[in-house]
């Protein structure tokens, strides 16, 4: 939800009159109720507030780091904050493309302590919180130096806590309020509340998509974002290479002069999946080399097979009107049949892809149609010009005939250099399995216990595939091994559990490494 922070800035002077003057006290003067020390664990003393691992699958320098900071949570409410943060983060990671990149995202929670519970609201209550977040209408934003405090904590994390050389990609401030609030201030800061519509992390997923992906709200009048446009011209519209693919077309946004790619998207309606345009741009930014040292080389949108249809019309996401599968394959008789995807190069080197499309008879041996194409995808030489490294790939079989029930289709996108199959015509419907990563402390007597500062991390991988262990380090601990006798784990069932083992880092040993 893009919020109008210019309007918020206009009323800051009013907010100053509402919020008590002592709210702006320096960090060192923060009152801690009943004299309890914030840093309960020796390993946490290197940071102002304790840091909790919500989700960590790999090195912070290799993964995109998201930090959740709480506002309006008192010392007594820190368990609630951790529960809320974990709940929202886990929910967010069930939405594509966060889901596909769950092995490439690390999430931490900073337990900032507020003197009072809740958040301030313009024209209403005034609450003494650490970041001084206030609500104005449905929007949230910092007041009274909250921005500087959050930036200081970010610098502290980068210098003292995260794996060496890592940077925080974005900060999400979770507010202790049941109000339906949300906002994205810029690429660094976004906000949500502990509201009913955010119980599964939907608001967090939406707001962080603003910050990470630079995406706009598709119900607004603004046209300066990758998923909004001021033109309907199919040659010049920003998503021209995706027109006609998986429901992407041209539809009205918030006004008659603003346009969006889809009627069904998280950036228009909470609870809807991201459209293909938004998924691709969000995936690209999750692999920004300013924050990620080992980016995924290429993004391949889930391929589809379809018969001819309007490229500028906007279809419902799950429309079967033009999409062809093995269930309705006879519908393609006497029509052109297209196997298509759109790819985005995410690194500064050429990618070589091979596209194959076959139709095999119901007998399992007769090949009725077979086509192959090779593509060279230009390097992403300019981060700010992703279109130059984006291509629509397609094989069209003209005027097919003789298709019968039981015929099979086989479409593949293959890395021509390695032979790896990157996607197929079945990718969109693939089942997912969960790899649950547990973090345990191994004591001198050989017994183990859960590491209290780390939640179980759930990584999503395609069913019947493999997962490569990455042996992540944890601040204050030294990694010593896992319960797996191999580095690559077969994922055959719904869930696979892997336990990483650690020892408390010896005094004087710098962690993480």
Specify the residue positions occupied by each region the protein language model found.
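Sec-dependent signal peptide cleavage junction
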Residues: 16-30, 34
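Surface-exposed interfaces of beta-sheet-rich extracellular modules
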Residues: 25, 463-489
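Propeptide-to-catalytic entry region of secreted or membrane-anchored zinc metalloproteases
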Residues: 31-159, 417-419
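Active-site recognition of the HExxH zinc-binding catalytic motif
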Residues: 202-218
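Aromatic sugar-binding surface patches on proteins
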Residues: 378-397
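Conserved "repeat-terminator" motif of extracellular CCP/Sushi domains
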Residues: 432-440, 488-512
């Amino acid at each position: 939800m893009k919020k109008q922070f210019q309007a918020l800035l206009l009323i800051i002077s009013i907010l100053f009159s509402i919020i008590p003057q002592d709210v702006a006290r320096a960090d060192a003067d923060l009152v801690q109720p009943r004299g309890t020390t914030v840093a309960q664990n020796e390993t946490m003393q290197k940071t102002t507030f304790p840091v909790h691992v919500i989700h960590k699958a790999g090195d912070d320098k290799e993964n995109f780091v998201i930090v959740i900071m709480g506002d309006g949570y008192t010392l007594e409410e820190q368990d609630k904050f951790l529960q809320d943060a974990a709940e929202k983060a886990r929910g967010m990671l069930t939405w594509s493309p966060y889901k596909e990149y769950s092995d490439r995202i690390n999430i931490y929670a900073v337990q900032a302590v507020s003197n009072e519970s809740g958040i301030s609201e313009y024209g209403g209550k005034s609450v003494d919180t650490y970041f001084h977040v206030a609500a104005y209408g449905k929007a949230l934003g910092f007041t009274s130096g909250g921005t500087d405090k959050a930036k200081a904590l970010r610098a502290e994390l980068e210098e003292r806590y995260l794996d060496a050389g890592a940077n925080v990609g974005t900060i999400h401030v979770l507010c202790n309020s049941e109000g339906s609030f949300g906002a994205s201030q810029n690429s660094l800061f976004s906000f949500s509340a502990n509201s009913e519509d955010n119980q599964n992390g939907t608001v967090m997923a939406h707001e962080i998509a603003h910050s990470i992906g630079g995406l706009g709200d598709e119900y607004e009048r603004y046209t300066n974002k990758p998923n909004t446009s001021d033109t309907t011209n199919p040659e010049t519209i920003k998503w021209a290479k995706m027109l006609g693919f998986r429901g992407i077309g041209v539809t009205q946004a918030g006004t008659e002069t603003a346009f969006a790619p889809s009627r069904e998207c998280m950036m228009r309606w909470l609870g809807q999946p991201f459209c293909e345009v938004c998924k691709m741009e969000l995936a690209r930014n999750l692999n920004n080399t300013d924050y990620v040292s080992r980016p995924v080389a290429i993004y391949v949108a889930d391929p589809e097979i379809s018969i001819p249809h309007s490229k500028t019309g906007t279809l419902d996401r799950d429309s079967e009107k033009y999409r062809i599968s093995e269930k309705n394959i006879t519908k393609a008789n006497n029509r052109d049949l297209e196997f298509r995807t759109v790819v985005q190069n995410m690194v500064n080197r050429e990618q070589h892809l091979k596209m194959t499309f076959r139709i095999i008879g119901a007998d399992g041996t007769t090949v009725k149609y077979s086509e192959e194409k090779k593509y060279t995808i230009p390097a992403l030489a300019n981060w700010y010009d992703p279109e130059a490294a984006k291509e629509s790939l397609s094989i069209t079989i003209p005027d097919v005939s003789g298709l019968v029930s039981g015929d099979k289709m086989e479409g593949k996108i293959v890395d021509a250099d390695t032979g790896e199959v990157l996607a197929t015509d079945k990718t969109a419907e693939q089942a997912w399995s969960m790899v649950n990563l547990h973090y345990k402390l191994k004591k001198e007597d050989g017994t183990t216990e859960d590491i209290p500062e780390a939640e179980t991390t759930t990584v999503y991988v395609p069913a019947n595939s493999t997962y490569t262990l990455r042996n992540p380090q944890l601040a204050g601990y030294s990694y010593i091994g896992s319960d797996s006798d191999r580095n690559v784990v077969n994922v055959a069932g719904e869930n696979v559990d892997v336990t990483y083992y650690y020892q408390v880092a010896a005094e004087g040993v710098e962690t993480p490494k």
